[in-house]
Amino acid sequence: MTVDAATVRRIAHLARIAVDDAEVPHLQGELNAILAFVEQLQEVNVDGVEPMTSVMPMEMKKRADVVNDGGIADKIVGNAPVTDDHFFLVPKVVE
């Protein structure tokens, strides 16, 4: 796949980048070099290779997933002006 001058101008327009006519050939060469490198990467055989999330192998720290109320429910409900059985009571707003 090669990039022509019209494609360079279209990419510049989509990216909202001002490109002079003198810059188009240089950018065309740069984009073609990038695409050539991507095509070269596609030729690499990666069958059986595990995908990596990092260059350095790391294991995620795991913790027990324990459900709790935080132990401060009484303090939270205590901030409300009116409560009933650990529920906030608010004025009725819809008739």
Swiss-Prot record:
Heterotrimer of A, B and C subunits. Allows the formation of correctly charged Asn-tRNA(Asn) or Gln-tRNA(Gln) through the transamidation of misacylated Asp-tRNA(Asn) or Glu-tRNA(Gln) in organisms which lack either or both of asparaginyl-tRNA or glutaminyl-tRNA synthetases. The reaction takes place in the presence of glutamine and ATP through an activated phospho-Asp-tRNA(Asn) or phospho-Glu-tRNA(Gln). It comes from the Bacteria. Gene3D superfamilies: Glu-tRNAGln amidotransferase C subunit, N-terminal domain (1.10.20.60). This is Aspartyl/glutamyl-tRNA(Asn/Gln) amidotransferase subunit C. The lineage of its organism: Bacteria, Pseudomonadati, Pseudomonadota, Alphaproteobacteria, Hyphomicrobiales. Keywords: ATP-binding, Ligase, Nucleotide-binding, Protein biosynthesis. It holds the Pfam family GatC. GO terms for molecular function: asparaginyl-tRNA synthase (glutamine-hydrolyzing) activity; ATP binding; glutaminyl-tRNA synthase (glutamine-hydrolyzing) activity. Its EC number is 6.3.5.-. It catalyses: L-glutamyl-tRNA(Gln) + L-glutamine + ATP + H2O = L-glutaminyl-tRNA(Gln) + L-glutamate + ADP + phosphate + H(+); L-aspartyl-tRNA(Asn) + L-glutamine + ATP + H2O = L-asparaginyl-tRNA(Asn) + L-glutamate + ADP + phosphate + 2 H(+). Belongs to the GatC family. The keyword Manganese does not apply. Coiled coil: none annotated. GO terms for biological process: glutaminyl-tRNAGln biosynthesis via transamidation; regulation of translational fidelity; translation.
